């Protein structure tokens, strides 16, 4: 199996409990920039190092919001020929969904609030917090 990671902190914690051989590969995809809302423009910041051809793939994401970024990403990854492609997310905001994205494994459904910590950031800050908190804007 191969995992693609949106939330490095999450997968590092979970990898300690995985008892089967896996290959971890990291990909960085962004549609936020320095804003709190998705721009809708998907940017591949870092692509995968390994081929997905005929592999069982689980995309591990920190948060699923509008679905725009993940819809684009999942379609792109399907074109690379994996045997299967599943999506796991720590946090899901289903009420924010603009594009239908099927999430196979969800940690927590959360309301439409901007959250930081445990790998999630606001303008590259607060990623290091050992918990997830809500940012309140005035």
Show the residue positions of the predicted features.
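Single conserved hydrophobic/aromatic residue that forms the stacking wall/gate
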Residues: 1-6
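Active-site loops and adjacent core secondary-structure elements that bind or stabilize anionic groups
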Residues: 9-10
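Active-site signature of alpha/beta-hydrolase-fold catalytic machinery across serine-
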Residues: 13, 72, 76
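Short helix-capping segments at alpha-helix termini
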Residues: 17-21, 80-81
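Short, glycine/charge-rich flexible loops or terminal/linker lids adjacent to PRPP-binding catalytic cores
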Residues: 21-57, 66-72, 99
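Residue-level marker for buried hydrophobic side chains located in beta-strands
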Residues: 58-59, 118
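PRPP-dependent phosphoribosyltransferase catalytic core
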Residues: 75, 79-138
């Amino acid at each position: 199996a191969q995992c693609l990671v949106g939330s490095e902190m999450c997968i590092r914690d979970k990898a300690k409990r995985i008892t089967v051989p896996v290959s971890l590969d990291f990909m960085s995809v962004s549609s936020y920039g320095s804003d709190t809302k998705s721009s809708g423009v998907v940017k591949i910041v870092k692509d995968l190092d390994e081929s997905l051809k005929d592999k069982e793939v689980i995309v591990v994401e920190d948060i699923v919001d509008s679905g725009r970024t993940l819809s684009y990403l999942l379609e792109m990854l399907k074109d690379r020929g994996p045997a299967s492609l599943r999506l796991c997310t720590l946090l899901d905001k289903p009420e924010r969904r603009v594009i239908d994205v099927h999430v196979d494994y969800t940690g927590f459904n959360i309301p439409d609030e901007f959250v930081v910590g445990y790998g999630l950031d606001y303008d590259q800050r607060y990623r290091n917090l050992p918990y997830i908190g809500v940012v309140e804007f005035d």
